[in-house]
UniProtKB/Swiss-Prot annotation:
Organism: Shigella boydii serotype 4 (strain Sb227)
PANTHER family referenced in this protein's UniProt entry, alphabetically: K(+)_H(+) ANTIPORTER SUBUNIT KHTT (PTHR30445), TRANSPORT PROTEIN YIDE-RELATED (PTHR30445:SF3)
Topology relative to the membrane: Multi-pass membrane protein
Name this polypeptide is given: Putative transport protein YidE
HAMAP family associated with the record: YidE
Annotated SUPFAM superfamilies: TrkA C-terminal domain-like
Homology family: Belongs to the AAE transporter (TC 2.A.81) family. YidE subfamily.
Domain RCK C-terminal: 191-276, 279-361
GO CC term, one of those recorded: plasma membrane
Name of the encoding gene: yidE
Keywords: Cell membrane, Membrane, Repeat, Transmembrane, Transmembrane helix, Transport
Sample GO molecular function, one term: monoatomic cation transmembrane transporter activity
Compartments where located: Cell membrane
InterPro entries: AAE_transporter, RCK_C, RCK_C_sf, Transpt_YidE_put, YidE_YbjL
Membrane-spanning residues: 4-24, 28-48, 65-85, 95-115, 158-178, 371-391, 393-413, 439-459, 464-484, 493-513, 533-553
């Protein structure tokens, strides 16, 4: 058998063994995709014992390409929500998550200096302790750029594997400990979270208001500032027994009922200007109007602003709200449409059908992947990651590398959505498949390279010490920030658990947090809020630590 055939066969065996290990669960918790790393270690141990020779060049290419696939698909997935997560609504959560990253970096630096841990080893421990595989890839690349021998670089994967198991268990232990310390009642926390969502400003709400302000009588909707802005959409108007879709030129009269869509604070302001909320239904049932959700798939409307499509004027159809990447938005006239946007339309059936034809509404297109944008994005990401940034006093130029470059490019392209007829939307199933393929390839190679010396290091070497260092890097930031968030910020416990899981980019921890109260969406919401920024920081941090430690000797 040729070296290439043998290498591919061994990698396939690693994937099978690793995925099997990852699917084994204890009380609902398993290693997940991280099991591939340990599958690689097991197979790598026996490969080393058997004296087999694998193609090192091929392994290197597969490892790097797997990493690129993984970080690129992550960026495309979270890109639409990344910049939104940095706004005020998620600012507090992101600040606490960033603090966890910073404290973790400080603990790593202190351990490195106190115990004189070799640089590749301490970076591997850091990456494993925070259960972040792209951080491992980024650290290995910067070490190679700094001229570190390959046998030392490979030690990073071994120390990563030592620290990884407690990285997963440590965050679960932290959640449990914080629950005990603060005597948390999970049911009460879930109710408080739901109440804050109802009264807060993050959700899109609807309200029916009766026009009671005499100053508004006989005015067109476009002449009422609060109704002509981008914060509130008036999607229905009921006069006596007639329900219709209002246009900007529609004249409102005293006693009219308006169905408004917007954030709670804006709807409250509308009440103060227009009149009181009423309990009367403005449902389209039994009328000649209907409400329908339509998906944007027509390449000709991508990038166009809603107001430039003139749906109100041409078709008498109102877009009441827009869902983008799972986030509900008010359908402001200035919003540019992206592939995969889901619009709520209100109007007559024939008019809605006409608008749906304009927008595309081709469900089958959502399952198709445009491969050209994928490779354009990957190529641009690799180029971005290869750009050197020279900093005075640093021994090597800083680069985003094969982990950071594709990630940042994917975040940008995911946020832009489309350029001309190229769109970077990727069906969730396709995104997940490519992401899983990438991480399996990457971890398989890392495990294979680490397997030969793993058992000896654990039994006769410093493996147990590495596990202890990793436990500190995992636990100290999580416990510190958890206590601060609860005591100082009075953060909801379920929200805090999601934030802690997101700060470690740890899906098993999110699954554990979700199981604390299966009907509450608090953990998933906070996890998604901090995940994009933290993933970026986790990839950059080992590179900064490597250059810093290298420069100060």
């Amino acid at each position: 058998m040729s070296d290439i055939a043998l290498t591919v066969s061994i990698l396939a065996l690693v994937a099978v063994v690793g995925l099997f290990i990852g699917n084994v669960k204890f009380r609902g918790i398993g290693l997940g995709i991280g099991g591939v790393l340990f599958g690689g270690i097991i197979v790598g141990h026996f490969v080393s014992q058997a004296g087999m020779t694998l193609s090192s060049d091929m392994l290197h290419v597969i490892q790097e390409f797997g990493l690129i696939l993984f970080v690129y698909t992550i960026g495309i997935q979270v890109g639409p929500g990344f910049f939104a997560s940095l706004r005020v609504s998620g600012l507090r959560l992101n600040l606490f998550a960033v603090l966890i990253v910073i404290i973790g970096g400080l603990v790593t630096a202190i351990l490195h200096k106190l115990f004189d841990i070799p640089l590749p080893v301490v970076l591997g421990i850091f990456s494993g302790a925070v259960t972040n595989t792209p951080a491992l890839g980024a650290g290995q690349q910067i070490l190679r750029d700094l001229g570190t021998p390959m046998e030392m670089v490979d030690q990073m994967g071994m120390s990563y594997a030592m620290a990884y198991p407690f990285g997963i268990c440590g965050i679960l232990f932290t959640m449990w400990m914080l629950r005990v310390i603060f005597r948390v009642n999970v049911e009460t926390e879930a109710q408080q979270h739901e109440s804050s969502r109802t009264n807060g400003g993050a959700l899109i709400k609807t309200i029916n208001i009766r026009v009671e302000n005499p100053n508004l009588h006989d005015l067109a909707i476009k002449d009422v500032p609060i109704l002509n802005g981008d914060k509130i959409i008036c999607s229905r108007l009921k006069r006596e027994e007639t329900l219709k879709v209002p246009s900007p030129d529609t004249i409102i009269q005293l006693g009219d009922l308006l169905h408004l869509v917007g954030q709670p604070a804006d709807l409250h302001n509308a009440q103060l200007v227009i009149g009181q909320e009423v309990d009367t239904s403005l449902s389209t049932k039994g009328t000649d109007l209907r409400v329908e959700r339509v998906v944007v798939t027509n390449e000709n409307v991508l990038g166009k602003r809603i107001r430039d499509l003139h749906f109100k004027e041409r078709y008498d159809v109102v877009i009441s709200r827009l869902n983008r990447a799972g986030v509900e938005l008010v359908a402001s006239g200035d919003i540019s449409l992206q592939f995969g946007d889901i619009l709520n339309l209100v109007g007559r059936p024939s008019a809605i059908d006409a608008v749906a034809n304009v927008l595309g509404n081709a469900q089958q297109k959502l399952q198709q992947v445009q491969m050209l944008p994928v490779f354009i994005g990957i190529g641009l990401g690799v180029l971005l990651g290869s750009i050197p940034v020279f900093v005075p006093g640093f021994p090597a130029a800083l680069k985003l590398g094969l982990a950071g470059g594709p990630l940042i490019m994917a975040l940008i392209l995911g946020r832009i959505g489309s350029i001309g007829k190229l769109y970077w939307f990727m069906p969730p199933s396709a995104n997940l498949a490519l992401r899983e393929l990438g991480i399996v390839l990457f971890l398989s190679v890392v495990g294979l390279k680490s397997g030969g010396d793993f058992v000896n290091t654990l039994v006769n070497g410093e493996g147990l010490s590495w596990i202890g260092y990793g436990a500190l890097i995992t636990a100290v930031p999580l416990i510190t920030v958890g206590i601060l968030a609860r005591m100082l910020a009075k953060m909801n416990y379920l929200t805090m658990c999601g934030m802690l899981a997101g700060s470690m980019t740890d899906p098993p921890a999110l699954a554990f947090a979700n199981n604390l109260h299966p009907t509450s969406g608090a953990p998933a919401l906070s996890y998604a809020t901090v995940y994009p920024l933290v993933m970026f920081l986790r990839i950059i941090t080992p590179q900064l630590l490597a250059v810093l430690f290298w420069s100060i000797g």
